Swiss-Prot record:
This is Methyl-branched alkylpyrone synthesis polyketide synthase-like Pks11. It comes from the Bacteria. One of its GO terms (biological process) is fatty acid biosynthetic process. Its EC number is 2.3.1.-. Keywords: Acyltransferase, Fatty acid metabolism, Lipid metabolism, Transferase. CDD domains: CHS_like. The active site is at 138 (nucleophile). Belongs to the thiolase-like superfamily. Chalcone/stilbene synthases family. It catalyses: methylmalonyl-CoA + hexadecanoyl-CoA + malonyl-CoA + 2 H(+) = 4-hydroxy-5-methyl-6-pentadecylpyran-2-one + 2 CO2 + 3 CoA; methylmalonyl-CoA + octadecanoyl-CoA + malonyl-CoA + 2 H(+) = 4-hydroxy-5-methyl-6-heptadecylpyran-2-one + 2 CO2 + 3 CoA; hexanoyl-CoA + 2 malonyl-CoA + 2 H(+) = 4-hydroxy-6-pentylpyran-2-one + 2 CO2 + 3 CoA; dodecanoyl-CoA + 2 malonyl-CoA + 2 H(+) = 4-hydroxy-6-undecylpyran-2-one + 2 CO2 + 3 CoA.
Length: 353
């Protein structure tokens, strides 16, 4: 068993209302003639505002992938360090306590990876184990928590951390007037989050408040590579998003959740807290419909989408933090649930302390 000891979310300082972002986008080169559909998609996203890593007026001139990626590396390390220090403080631990660091991102390329750069900035021990996760996209927050558990099962005295940083706005140089690209401009924001987890023996020493990470399950769906991902070129990273995404959720998700819970002699009625990635309005509705959830079950998911947009892998960790702050009843079960490129689902079973 592993225990979550701290969670912290970090957001860049530049915050704009959805209407401000929309007004800026319609002035991007080549997008003015698509103003009607841009405004319609942005209005339908149910996003009230987003944080961006750059001032809004700088984006129209950011046309080179290399320039955008240099900004990504600098700002991602800054935000990642902020998130990790916050989570360590929440756990009453220090950077020198970290035995393993995992990082998750899909919105920029860094070699050496973000974990090496964050380790250098914070002075992590030279024997720290590193696990960079790239390409998982929106599922990486839940999958990263699952991988912390996998590691700590064999290292019950250790401290393992996950740092997720997504600067989705830096993919704007690749935006073209396709439905996928324009949906992305309506939903995605910038942000980071970190989780500190400890093995069961270390949990007793630091009096970790939980929740416990009990189990996880991954599901990779057949013939679904086309559903979501990046089209990568000299333009940078351009979003690929199939309208079949919600159909795939409705086809597979209920059975995935039911069989996973069955293995623990649980049902959906036993889940007191649903920690679900926000995706977008259609994704949230598909999850709720597939699992026959009452409206209040995904209230924190809807709230996160409205307040900060979709932060890709970092979103579910912000929602995890918000859920912990609500203090679910001791002994009750929680379920983390996210989906991403592959196409795939990651489920993580929690138990509140």
């Amino acid at each position: 068993m592993s225990v979550i000891a701290g969670v912290f979310g970090a957001l860049p300082p530049h915050r704009y209302s959805q209407s401000e972002i929309t007004d800026s986008f319609v002035e991007f080169p080549g997008l003015k003639e698509h103003e009607e559909i841009i405004r319609r998609l942005h209005a339908a996203a149910k996003v009230n505002g987003r944080h961006l890593v750059l001032p809004l007026q700088q984006y129209p001139s950011l046309t080179d992938f290399g320039d955008a990626n240099e900004i990504f590396i600098e700002k991602a390390v800054d935000l990642g360090v902020e998130a990790l220090l916050g989570a360590l403080d929440d756990a009453n631990l220090r950077p020198s306590d970290i035995d393993m660091i995992a990082t998750a991102t899909v919105t920029g390329v860094a070699v050496p990876s973000l974990d090496a750069r964050i380790a250098g900035r914070l002075g992590l021990r030279p024997d720290v184990r590193r696990m960079p996760l790239f390409g998982l996209g929106c599922v990486a927050g839940a999958a990263g928590v699952a991988r912390l558990r996998d590691y700590l099962r064999g290292a019950p005295d250790d401290v393992a951390v996950l740092v997720s940083v997504e600067l989705c706005s830096l993919t704007y140089p690749a935006v073209k007037p396709t439905v996928s690209s324009l949906v992305g401009t309506a939903l995605f924001g910038d942000g980071a989050a970190a989780v500190v987890a400890v093995g069961d023996r270390r949990a007793e020493q630091v009096r970790a408040g939980g929740p416990d990470i009990l189990d996880s399950r991954s599901s990779l769906y057949p013939d679904s590579l086309h559903i979501m991902g990046w089209d990568v070129g000299s333009h940078g990273l351009r979003l690929r998003l199939s309208p079949d995404l919600t159909n795939l959720i409705e086809r597979y998700l209920a059975n995935d959740v039911t069989t996973f819970l069955d293995a623990h002699r649980l049902t959906k009625d036993d889940i007191g807290a649903w920690v679900s990635h926000p995706g977008g309005p259609k994704v949230i509705d598909a999850v709720a419909t597939s699992l026959a959830l009452p409206p209040e079950a995904l209230e924190l998911t809807w709230r996160s989408l409205g307040e900060i947009g979709n932060l890709s892998s970092a979103s579910i960790l912000h929602i995890l933090r918000d859920t912990i702050e609500k203090r679910p009843p001791s002994g009750s079960a929680g379920l983390m649930l996210a989906m991403g490129p592959g196409f795939c689902t990651e489920l993580v079973l929690l138990r509140w302390r």
